[in-house]
C-alpha cells in the first residue's frame, strides 16, 4: 500500500540518518496524491480496471494486496478482480474493463511496447472497448510495486491512465 511505501522511505531515512530528506519525500508524495485525488474527484466516470502481467506468456491478474491496486483505488478507479492469479482471455472479456494496466518487469522493459501490442492485438479481446480505444497502459514494476521514491511517478501514470486529461 501507499502507507507501506511511506514507512519504507522513512525507515530508510532513519537507517541512513537522513530523516528530514525522507520526510520531505513522503510529504511530496502525499501532496501529489492529494492533488491527483482532487482532480480525479471532478471526473464523472470512474473507470473499471484490471492490472495484468505476462508471466511465461500467460496473463496474471494482480489483486488487492499490492501497491498498484491501492493506487488505482485511491485515485477512484474500480478494481474488477481482487485476487492474484493466472487469468484467461475469457475472464477478461467477462470483466469488460475500461482500462488495463500492464505491469512490466525489469527483464521485459526493452520489449514493453511489444507486450502492449500483443495484448492490444489479441483477437479474442478485440471486442473490448479498452482494446478498441487502446486504453492499455504500461506500468513499470519500479513505479507500481516497491516503488519507494518513485511512488509519485507511479501515481501519475495510474492517474493519466484512468483520466487521460488529468495533469
Regions from the language model: what does each represent?
Residues 21-75:
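Basic- and aromatic-lined ligand-binding clefts that recognize polyanionic substrates
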Amino acid at each position: 500500500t501507499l502507507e507501506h511505501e511511506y514507512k519504507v522511505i522513512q525507515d530508510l531515512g532513519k537507517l541512513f540518518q537522513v530523516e528530514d530528506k525522507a520526510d520531505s519525500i513522503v510529504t511530496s508524495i502525499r501532496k501529489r496524491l492529494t492533488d491527483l485525488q482532487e482532480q480525479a474527484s471532478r471526473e464523472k466516470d470512474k473507470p473499471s480496471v484490471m492490472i495484468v502481467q505476462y508471466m511465461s506468456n500467460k496473463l496474471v491478474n494482480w489483486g488487492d494486496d499490492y501497491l498498484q491496486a491501492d493506487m488505482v483505488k485511491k485515485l477512484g478507479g474500480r478494481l474488477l478482480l481482487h485476487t492474484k492469479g493466472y487469468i484467461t482471455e475469457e475472464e477478461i472479456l467477462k470483466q469488460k474493463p475500461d482500462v488495463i494496466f500492464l505491469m512490466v518487469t525489469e527483464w521485459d522493459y526493452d520489449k514493453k511496447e511489444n507486450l502492449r501490442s500483443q495484448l492490444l492485438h489479441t483477437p479474442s479481446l478485440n471486442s473490448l472497448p479498452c482494446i478498441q480505444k487502446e486504453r492499455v497502459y504500461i506500468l513499470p514494476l519500479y513505479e507500481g510495486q516497491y516503488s519507494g521514491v518513485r511512488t509519485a511517478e507511479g501515481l501519475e501514470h495510474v492517474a493519466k491512465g484512468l483520466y487521460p486529461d488529468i495533469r
